[in-house]
Curated annotation (Swiss-Prot):
Name this protein carries in UniProt: Probable G-protein coupled receptor 132
Keyword hit for Phosphoprotein: no
Reported tissue expression: Highly expressed in macrophages and hematopoietic tissues rich in lymphocytes, like spleen and thymus. Weakly expressed in heart and lung. In atherosclerotic plaques, expression is observed around the lipid core and at the shoulder region.
Keywords: Cell membrane, Disulfide bond, G-protein coupled receptor, Glycoprotein, Membrane, Receptor, Stress response, Transducer, Transmembrane, Transmembrane helix
Induction of expression: By stress and DNA-damaging agents.
PANTHER family reported in the protein's UniProt record: G-PROTEIN COUPLED RECEPTOR 132-RELATED, LYSOPHOSPHATIDIC ACID RECEPTOR 5/SPHINGOSYLPHOSPHORYLCHOLINE RECEPTOR
Cellular compartment(s): Cell membrane
Residues annotated as transmembrane: 46-68, 80-102, 117-138, 159-178, 198-220, 247-269, 289-311
Protein's GO biological process: G1/S transition of mitotic cell cycle; negative regulation of G2/M transition of mitotic cell cycle
Stretches in topological domain Cytoplasmic: 69-79, 139-158, 221-246, 312-380
Length: 380
């Protein structure tokens, strides 16, 4: 393994380290380029990963719970929503490791197994999410455009089988990540060769271009079908239109930049015919953009719950019910706390303290007049 000279972001000195990438295990060349700076993207990566982790964990927990309730009621679409939420939840749970790694100047100190597992979860999550977005769009397309024909044919068992196939297929494709042998760095790039170029072409075509075409086509047909419907109000049609547009926009924003960088690198390798100096120059110029765009794909973990669960009627009703229950519980808690506080204040008042101490009261014979001076509250 050739050492790589990395610019130290704090003192500007070059530090020799050994660099690997999760796809190094594919039998690809481990030769690297020099003078790749990690400091340029450090702040952006730390901020984005921290924000996605903070927002994504509770959002996907709520999404998974709401989707599970719908699955138990026989909702087919909810199967894909549940799998997507669980996948995103697993990934967002690993983001703190990314933050530690980046803050440590891309030096992995948590052990080789942790690097392998984190890399495996990350790259699997990208394409599992993309495929589940396709499944969700296709299921909505069938349910809306072919509402009568699909009645009784959309089954929960079929959705579970498709979900299992997605997990197995993506898991097998990325399994070679576990054969990585390097120990000091993780997730970083290698110099291009013909096999990596082919891998990038495949990822762009199968992992992005085809799914994007499916999502764009299905949502366009959904919108057109709803537009021609006479049974929906203008507000309902606008809601469906905005939802369809949002799906495509989020997909493009999260996944298009990174896959376009992959395509540029693969095309440049083909154009320069593998010239090492030309490719190293390209790697050094595109490295910061590449890792930032890769980081941008994690925003999908926050966007998916908003689009596919919180925007649906059933989910909004469930969220409203949970919020109402939480509000009632909070009000009861506030009343209890206020009552307890008021009782405490009364116990601390002079009159209350006097009442709580035992004093012998004067005994008046029957029929005798009351004393002239007494507390108003005291009776004869």
């Amino acid at each position: 393994m050739c050492p790589m000279l990395l610019k130290n972001g704090y003192n500007g000195n070059a530090t020799p380290v050994t660099t690997t990438a999760p796809w190094a295990s594919l039998g690809l060349s481990a030769k690297t380029c020099n003078n790749v700076s990690f400091e340029e993207s450090r702040i952006v990566l730390v901020v984005v990963y921290s924000a996605v982790c903070t927002l994504g964990v509770p959002a996907n927990c709520l999404t998974a719970w709401l989707a599970l309730l719908q699955v138990l009621q026989g909702n087919v679409l909810a199967v894909y929503l549940l799998c997507l939420a669980l996948c995103e939840l697993l990934y967002t749970g690993t983001l703190p490791l990314w933050v530690i790694y980046i803050r440590n100047q891309h030096r992995w100190t948590l052990g080789l197994l942790a690097c392998k597992v984190t890399a495996y979860i990350f790259f699997c999550n990208i394409y599992v999410s993309i495929l589940f977005l396709c499944c969700i769009s296709c299921d909505r397309f069938v349910a809306v455009v072919y509402a009568l024909e699909s009645r009784g044919r959309r089954r929960r068992r079929t959705a579970i089988l498709i979900s299992a196939c997605i997990f197995i297929l993506v898991g097998i494709v990325h399994y070679p990540v576990f054969q990585t042998e390097d120990k000091e760095t993780c997730f970083d790039m290698l110099q291009m060769d013909s096999r990596i170029a082919g891998y990038y072409y495949a990822r762009f075509t199968v992992g992005f271009a085809i799914p994007l075409s499916i999502i764009a086509f299905t949502n366009h047909r959904i919108f057109r079908s709803i537009k021609q419907s006479m049974g929906l109000s203008a507000a309902q049609k606008a809601k469906v239109k905005h939802s369809a547009i949002a799906v495509v926009v989020i997909f493009l924003v999260c996944f298009a930049p990174y896959h376009l960088v992959l395509l540029v690198k693969a095309a440049a390798f083909s154009y320069y015919r593998g010239d090492r100096n030309a490719m190293c120059g390209l790697e050094e110029r595109l490295y910061t953009a590449s890792v930032v765009f890769l980081c941008l794909s994690t925003v999908n973990g926050v966007a998916d719950p908003i689009i596919y669960v919180l925007a649906t009627d059933h989910s909004r009703q469930e969220v409203s019910r949970i919020h109402k229950g939480w509000k009632e519980w909070s009000m009861k808690t506030d009343v209890t706390r206020l009552t307890h506080s008021r009782d405490t204040e009364e116990l601390q008042s002079p009159v209350a303290l006097a009442d709580h101490y035992t004093f012998s009261r004067p005994v008046h014979p029957p029929g005798s007049p009351c004393p002239a001076k007494r507390l108003i509250e005291e009776s004869c």
